[in-house]
Amino acid sequence: MRIIDSVADMQAFSRDARRSGKTIALVPTMGYLHDGHASLMREGRTRADILVVSIFVNPTQFGPNEDFTTYPRDLERDLQVAEAAGADVIFAPRADDMYPAGFQTYVDVEKVTLPLCGASRPGHFRGVTTVVAKLFNIVMPHTAFFGKKDFQQLAVIRRMVADLNMDLSIVGMPIIREPDGLAMSSRNAYLGPQERTNALCLNRSLAAARTLFTDGERSVARLRDTVLRILTEVPGAAIDYADFRDSETLEPVEAANEKTLLALAVKIGTTRLIDNCVLGEEQ
């Protein structure tokens, strides 16, 4: 496995690979890798000749009072996880190489970034789309893999790729969960033992909504009441949003159907967690 920390070296590697007819898969990450990331890598491994995993804690997607400085980092462990999952190349650039002095160009997807996380984290998605566009230009992948836990992020990236005629395929991969149902996330490392138990309320509320939907409930108001009841029973849980949206457009809906997205963002203590499900999809 090769480690590349220079933008120029990564571009040179990818140009040579493409010239020789090889296909490239990219799994973009911020590091502190877990089995969710590994599932993306394993899928990427099956779909391309070369698997590149980027590890970069992107400063432009963090707000002024967010956790950029404390975001968990462990490069040595990340290298072991990536190699075990079949990575050929780790691209771990420096911030001053990605954003050199004088940098002033950003990619801003408009409508689909406004609700959900976009409402409570202004500027977040501008940072995400900018760094992802840069990674696409640097790594030059044929295919890139993203987890559906960040459902809105996946929708935003799909929109950017379509609107800017980027020549690659975007693959969304299922949420990977701990045995007790908690969605895997690097931020789970922040949770204390009691908070870790309390965090199970997210998946519990998703499961309750899915059960009601399967039993015939279509009223978003009644489904939301059930979700909120479960979340508010948990001490220290602060709800950012519990929203029902069309899973393709992210527009709000009043009557649920098979393609309705239930998206959650909840703070457990000081840790903001997100989770989601599409009501008609098997989990």
UniProtKB/Swiss-Prot annotation:
Broad class of enzyme this protein falls into: ligase
InterPro entries documented for this protein: Pantoate_ligase (IPR003721), Pantoate_ligase_C (IPR042176), Rossmann-like_a/b/a_fold (IPR014729)
MF-aspect GO terms: ATP binding; pantoate-beta-alanine ligase activity
Residue ranges the record marks as coiled coil: none
Residues holding (R)-pantoate: 61, 153
Single Gene Ontology BP annotation: pantothenate biosynthetic process
Record's keyword terms, sorted: ATP-binding, Cytoplasm, Ligase, Nucleotide-binding, Pantothenate biosynthesis
Binding site for beta-alanine: 61
SUPFAM superfamilies for this protein: Nucleotidylyl transferase
Subcellular location field: Cytoplasm
Protein EC: 6.3.2.1
Domain of life: Bacteria
Pathway recorded for this protein: Cofactor biosynthesis; (R)-pantothenate biosynthesis; (R)-pantothenate from (R)-pantoate and beta-alanine: step 1/1
Role according to the record: Catalyzes the condensation of pantoate with beta-alanine in an ATP-dependent reaction via a pantoyl-adenylate intermediate.
Subunit relationships: Homodimer.
The protein, known as: Pantothenate synthetase
Source organism per UniProt: Geobacter sulfurreducens (strain ATCC 51573 / DSM 12127 / PCA)
Gene encoding the protein: panC
